[in-house]
A protein has these predicted regions:
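Switch/communication elements of ASCE P-loop NTPase nucleotide-binding domains
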Residues: 1-79, 203-309
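Phosphate-coordinating catalytic segments in nucleotide- and nucleic-acid-processing enzymes
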Residues: 52-224
Length: 309
């Protein structure tokens, strides 16, 4: 479980100390702030650690980052790479290759490895060492990043829904003790969401599909669903049927494709899923409706930067 994330001088300015979970019963958090405070960037930095996108750390200005998973601590420091560029050139403009990232595991930072951008791009021995350390300490964690803005730009998640429908079909053909409960939660969420003039059908023959409530009972392709409908199905199916134990699901601005009534049900949907599955969910949002104004679940980045207000 991701318990905390601390970053100093994000974009050269912001210092944040985010506590995500304090117990096994505390697995949902919402990161909120106005535009420009780094909500989405924080999700991408977390994703970059767990999914080994280390080149991303050279693109984002920051001084130090500390991420805690259960009892394991990973620390990253962005330092000047003196061998890449003469000092007089570094004073003119900062480029990705002007920096190195120092990785260390543990609270004492006794053992550390420093990577340059060239190390990452050339898949050097030093990169292998860092990846092995990350894998050793965080091997039990899986991280999934769902970007709602990409849902609005592209329709690639329709093909992802086809894959998840096939997965559901396999689960129906080979059920376990939880399958019936998982199906019940999925049906609750779809029913609560009131998809417009359509209903879901679930079968061992095809997994799931949506059918229009017309005389012809027109069967819909996945790409016929709206971006909001796709998002609800994608999140629900992944977290209910595919996410392994202890999975961390990162969701970026789900309200962008949701009507206000759907936003009001979002926390209820997440709680129903998290209550059944041992997964953790971290959501970046502008909308307090998404977390039903339960501010105990929210981390306000603006408030951390302006505690006096």
């Amino acid at each position: 479980m991701l318990t905390s994330f601390k970053i100093n001088k994000l974009f050269g300015l912001y210092d944040y100390d985010l506590v995500f979970s304090e117990s096994n019963d505390d697995k949902i958090r919402f990161i909120t702030a106005t535009n420009g405070y780094g909500k989405s960037t924080i999700l991408r930095l977390i994703d970059a650690v767990f999914n080994h996108h280390l080149e991303f750390f050279f693109k984002i200005p920051f001084h130090e980052l500390t991420l805690t998973v259960d009892q394991a601590v990973l620390n990253l420091r962005r330092v000047k790479n003196a061998v890449s560029t003469p000092p007089e050139a570094m004073e003119v403009v900062d480029k990705d290759e002007d920096y190195a990232i120092e990785f260390s595991i543990g609270v004492d930072h006794l053992a550390s490895t420093t990577l340059t951008l060239e190390d990452v791009q050339s898949e050097s021995k030093e990169l292998d060492e860092v990846l092995q350390q990350i894998e050793m300490f965080f091997s039990s964690e899986t991280c999934k990043f769902i970007d709602d803005r990409r849902l609005l730009r592209e329709n690639t998640d329709a093909s992802e829904l086809v894959r998840l429908s096939d997965l559901l079909k396999e689960r129906l053909l080979h059920p376990d003790d939880n399958t019936e409960k998982q199906i019940a939660v999925l049906m609750d969420i779809v029913s609560r969401s009131c998809f417009a003039d359509k209903h879901i059908e679930i079968s061992k023959a095809f997994g799931f599909r949506f059918v229009m409530d017309n005389e012809d009972r027109t069967k819909l392709a996945m790409y016929d669903l709206s971006s909001g409908e796709q998002h609800i199905m994608l999140i629900s199916l992944y977290m209910l049927f595919e996410a392994p134990e202890k999975a961390i699901v990162l969701i970026d601005e789900p309200e962008m494709s949701f009507h206000l009534s759907w936003q009001g049900d979002y926390l209820k949907n997440l709680r129903q899923i998290v209550g059944l599955r041992n997964v953790q969910c971290i959501v970046a949002t502008h909308s307090p409706i998404i977390f039903d104004s339960e501010y105990s679940l929210a981390i306000d980045l603006y408030a951390q930067m302006h505690p006096e207000e």
